[in-house]
Amino acid sequence: MGSVKRKSVEESSDSAPPQKVQREDDSTQIINEELVGCVHDVSFPENYVPLAPSVHNKPPAKDFPFTLDSFQSEAIKCLDNGESVMVSAHTSAGKTVVASYAIAMSLKENQRVIYTSPIKALSNQKYRDFKEEFSDVGLMTGDVTIDPNASCLVMTTEILRSMQYKGSEIMREVAWIIFDEVHYMRDSERGVVWEESIVMAPKNSRFVFLSATVPNAKEFADWVAKVHQQPCHIVYTDYRPTPLQHYVFPAGGNGLYLVVDEKSKFHEDSFQKSLNALVPTNESDKKRDNGKFQKGLVIGKLGEESDIFKLVKMIIQRQYDPVILFSFSKKECEALAMQMSKMVLNSDDEKDAVETIFASAIDMLSDDDKKLPQVSNILPILKRGIGVHHSGLLPILKEVIEILFQEGLIKCLFATETFSIGLNMPAKTVVFTNVRKFDGDKFRWLSSGEYIQMSGRAGRRGIDKRGICILMVDEKMEPAVAKSMLKGSADSLNSAFHLSYNMLLNQLRCEEGDPENLLRNSFFQFQADRAIPDLEKQIKSLEEERDSLVIEEEESLKNYYNLILQYKSLKKDIREIVFTPKYCLPFLLPNRAVCLDCTNDDEEPQSFSIEDQDTWGVIMKFNKVKSLSEDDDSRRPEDANYTVDVLTRCMVSKDGVGKKKVKAVPIKERGEPVVVTVPLSQIKSLSSAIMNIPKDLVPLEARENALKKVSELLSRHPDGIPLDPEVDMKIKSSSYKKTVRRLEALENLFEKHKIAKSPLITEKLKVLQMKEELIAKIKSLKKTVRSSTALAFKDELKARKRVLRRLGYITSDNVVELKGKVACEISSAEELTLTELMFSGIFKDAKVEELVSLLSCFVWRERLPDAAKPREELDLLFIQLQDTARRVAEVQLDCKVEIDVESFVQSFRPDIMEAVYAWAKGSKFYEVMEIARVFEGSLIRAIRRMEEVLQQLIVAAKSIGETQLEAKLEEAVSKIKRDIVFAASLYL
């Protein structure tokens, strides 16, 4: 892949040469008061001979009323040369200028241009902006179609892909395709749509890719150049038009601490001062939310101001507004906004302006919808200059809040991180109410990429000299963690490609479609191929390291090592049987002495003894646990139901992020007597001894005395007088007896093994283990190389084709059948289950309202713990859906597609069936909300998505001549498409 790199600094300039600043990541940033530089690179396909740059005498397609930045003028030169370009720059840097020029150029040349964005809200905004500027502009989002024959079409990426598969006439005419927010390609669910669209784009079209800063922009451009056999330029800038200052606001404190200045220098002394200013909150004063301490909102005692109130007050006093305060939950967003109830930020004139704009916006709503609690409750806080923005809001309210924010009538906006995507709404200040977030699996620190994306909203170009970012910190944080978050690099643009049945069927149905070709040309395959030389280098290095480890009597030692592993595995099996709740619960009595395993595999080196390290303690009680802890990865599903509180000897320390860490240690070692909660799997044995210890164990002396009694027991009986599983606990399990016999046989082998008494055996075993680990790494890397050199997803592709043949979607010759034609049209829901239901006759037999209710299970993904069971007729339909889903999943499993059958079946949720049924029956939205008990915006999004699915089913029914079903589905659309749920966007 050819590459030419040049700095975009005009040599003819009379200005002083730009100053280079070496940053911590070794990259060079060019800074100059008059001219700020960028890196311009270009990727060529193999064997491509670049043409000499043409000299343009023709006037520019568009003039701008301001001086262009270097990166903008460099990108525009590429467009004038008729070549594709990727522009990678920070939020609010001015990437839209390049898109605007591409549109102007296309319209001037009478060419077709398509602008795509990841979200409908952004498409609506861009449509309004481009319509005002160019007039010949249309919009296609799935919800709305306006002037589809316009020369410039604004659409979502999903609509573009759909047009490509259908062989739309527009695709044959398009000269330029603009992909905005192309870094969305790494999204695990929707990112694949970008890859498909780019691969399938017409070969004679050119591209404009607009992206946030990504470190591997060159790799992406290399891929585009290879797939489309055309040059692709990269114009990359790290420059922020408005530099940022980063502050810490410690919980309970009163001041701001500058930790990173506008020159990106990290002030460690200031950071430490901010942590020292943290006011520790008493356990009783901490506000809890589902057992977790809420972040970012330390509530003062009665009469005191909360931290959030103090901070916003300070921001307003220092004229740092407008401010966006990011939170990671919809409920917390609203709770924080409510803490501002006494704060008034707008003048009387501004309040009147808010009321006028708000009244005008909701004028299209019915009188009933105007009385919705969310509508009536939000106006008072908006008038005070405070707003809330999250996905649970009614879409019309989200838009009116965006408009008020743009007009400067909202000074303080509480928003979730979705506000940082695409929408051009910068503020002077951005506040992070929390620096930790729950990612669906565990609580973790924000990544540098997430921080960069959200902090990019700070600083308004041409208005603010600098933008301000404030982190609210309420727990100790290591400087290294803070530095990596505040000064780390952006997230790489990595492929999230995955196969789907809809993709596969559309590829087989297309005249020029070829699933293998799509896989071969995917960014995923490109990245896999790229990694091979580096992997081979790693393998060679590891093989050299492996060969350098020479061990005496290696085979005999390996045999002994394997015996140790077998022994430990059998001991573990025995413990799992003995400590299943049905056997052990009757014996988990308070004050019983208990032996615990205190070997920690994550921290301790591998033990080569057949005995693990253990400690002793006293049982306090056992607990029934409802579900796995959100942030405890060590707890295993099989013992998730019970934990045991044990008083034992512990080492108490702080971990890398300042959190208290408690680890059980052998009872004779130094440490504190602490009550810890352990899973059943950590218990090694139960003693028959019940200790006589005081009830009040709060005093340290009482706890020390309790452990002293355990030590006295062990001095008399070193094994602690364990309960015998068979005699005392009455375990009659045949698998237990069988495992015990195998363990005894192994113990005999240990005694007889010739190497057991060999000198330095532990050191030899350590070397052997190192060698075994190297062998395992080499094997894993070789497997990766083999799978990389083969076509990615090749086995999965074969398996999915088997599924489609088994279910009757394609013939043995890969010709798409009737069922397959239906599934081709369904891209907004699980296509196989929906098609199977359609062909089973359920859609024909069900009433229209029941059909709509059933479809809600395909679009609702949130799990509502207190959702009521739907009425009998709806529940019967849901059971049929589950049966169909199970059958589809089991066929996939039989055909070797990796799938968890139960998880797949459980992914269809009945939680809003009743609410949607009521909506289809004609109920008012406020009545439906009383049934649903979810955020209004979440329900509206689900119903709109459902309408999308219905439209796809209408096209599917039409394609197979099912006119009766088509009419029924159209009736379903007419029943749900009304009132506030489908209120028109304010941007249109």
UniProtKB/Swiss-Prot annotation:
Main EC class of this protein? hydrolase
What broad class describes the main subcellular location of this protein?
A: nucleus
Which Gene Ontology MF annotations are present?
Answer: ATP binding; ATP hydrolysis activity; RNA helicase activity; rRNA binding
Alphabetized, the UniProt keywords read:
ATP-binding, Helicase, Hydrolase, Nucleotide-binding, Nucleus, RNA-binding, rRNA processing, rRNA-binding
A Pfam family in this protein? Answer: Helicase_C
For biological process, the GO terms are: RNA catabolic process; rRNA 3'-end processing; rRNA processing
Q: Found in which tissues?
A: Ubiquitous but preferentially expressed in active tissues.
A cellular-component GO term for this protein: nucleus
Specify the Helicase C-terminal domain's residue ranges. Answer: 307-509
Segments carrying the region annotation (Disordered) are 1-27
- Binding residues for ATP: 89-96
Keyword Ribonucleoprotein in annotation? no
Question: Where does the record place it?
Answer: Nucleus, Nucleolus
Where in this protein would one find the motif DEVH box, according to its record? 180-183
Q: Which domain of life is it from?
A: Eukaryota
Phenotype upon knockout? Answer: Slower embryogenesis and several developmental defects including aberrant vein patterning, pointed first and second leaves, smaller rosettes and shorter roots.
Might you give the EC number(s) for this enzyme? 3.6.4.13
Swiss-Prot/TrEMBL catalytic activity:
ATP + H2O = ADP + phosphate + H(+)
In this chain the Helicase ATP-binding domain maps to: 76-232
Q: Which family does it belong to?
A: Belongs to the DExH box helicase family. SKI2 subfamily.
- Function of the protein: ATP-dependent RNA helicase that associates with the RNA exosome complex. Required for proper rRNA biogenesis and development. Involved in the 3'-processing of the 7S pre-RNA to the mature 5.8S rRNA and also in the removal of rRNA maturation by-products.
From the Swiss-Prot or TrEMBL record, give the protein name. Answer: DExH-box ATP-dependent RNA helicase DExH9
| Protein species of origin | Arabidopsis thaliana
What phylogenetic lineage does the species belong to? Answer: Eukaryota, Viridiplantae, Streptophyta, Embryophyta, Tracheophyta
Gene name per UniProt: MTR4
